[in-house]
UniProtKB/Swiss-Prot annotation:
InterPro entries: Ribosomal_bL12, Ribosomal_bL12_C, Ribosomal_bL12_C/ClpS-like, Ribosomal_bL12_oligo, Ribosomal_bL12_oligo_N_sf. Forms part of the ribosomal stalk which helps the ribosome interact with GTP-bound translation factors. Is thus essential for accurate translation. This is Large ribosomal subunit protein bL12c. Residues 104-127 are annotated as: Disordered. The gene is rpl12. GO terms for biological process: translation. It is found in: Plastid, Chloroplast. The lineage of its organism: Eukaryota, Sar, Stramenopiles, Ochrophyta, Bacillariophyta.
Amino acid sequence: MSEKIDQIVEELKTLTLLEASELVSKIEETFDVDASASVGGGMMMAGPAVVEEVEEKTEFDVMLDEVPADKKIAVLKVVRSLTGLGLKEAKELVESAPKQIQEGVAKDAAEEAKKQIEDAGGKASLK
């Protein structure tokens, strides 16, 4: 090694952990590199790994899975309020469970609908 490299190595040996961390950050910033990519060491020789980005689902279907006989009226009221269906249509939907009651709703709204159904005594799921 050259004398210059030896001097740099000796200087690096004297750095505290905090100073070393700051140095890494500064090198990443200055040279637009990511030090965490090289941490794998031998893994890098295996070839580039394909990383698939997992998208978080934003729309959900609310499914009415099961309605106990003694909770049918309470669940029927919740289904009517969630769907806007008439009494006859909501009754048919509740009696034909498992059935989808809402489609393509936001996560918060879907979780709230599921909670309402479960609070009324039914079983619901999100898909």
